[in-house]
Amino acid sequence: MSFKEFPIMPDKSKGVMLFYPYVSKKSSNNLKRKLSGRWLGQGPMVNKFEDKFKNMFGKKNSAIATGSGTDSLHLAYILAGLKKGDEVITTVFTCTATNIPLLYMGIKIKFADVEKETMNISLESVKKLISKKTKAIICVHYGGLPCDMSGLKNLAKKFKIPIIED
């Protein structure tokens, strides 16, 4: 059965199928090769991927492959210097991956409202929530629509705190 032939509701008792992953034949073959090798995590293929990614964005940058978006955000929070007891502002409208690492790290979350036009974090709401205790602003570019980055950057610069983009 091809991707286009896959029914949206294969079994009415299970509801609407929201996600059906498409994996190309090339990717499937690469995955089979990876799983039949002795390196499941870090190894030659990951090193090759990191090198290619790094070269795409300039040799001065480094690239670290992670197992998931949640892992990537957790690493970003650590690299931003966030620690237990710190306070961050983030959007109320996001995937759990944004907040689970914060909870795991013992960081206090203040939820900002969203703009009704874009569903992105509201700059005005962030302004009301920001304080001397705020250690970062975490924004999510929902549905491919960019947040008001110039406004967020100005606010972050004023309070000397980082912006972490999801």
Outline where the language-model segments fall.
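N-terminal "arm"/small-domain region of PLP-dependent enzymes with the aminotransferase-like
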Residues: M1-L40
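Glycine-/small-residue-rich active-site loops that bind phosphorylated ligands and cofactors
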Residues: V23, G41, T94, E117-T118, ...
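Generic structural signal for small/hydrophobic residues in well-ordered secondary structure
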Residues: N30-L31, F53, S72, V88, ...
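Solvent-exposed, non-membrane alpha-helical residues enriched in polar/charged side chains
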Residues: K32, S36, E50-K54, H74, ...
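Phosphate-binding glycine-rich loop
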Residues: W39, P44-E87, P101-M105, F111-D113
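Short N-terminal helix/helix-N-cap motif within the alpha/beta-hydrolase-1
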Residues: H74, F93, C147-S150
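Conserved coil-to-alpha-helix start sites within the AMP-binding
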Residues: F93-N99
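Active-site phosphate-binding strand-loop segment of PLP-dependent enzymes
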Residues: E117-E165
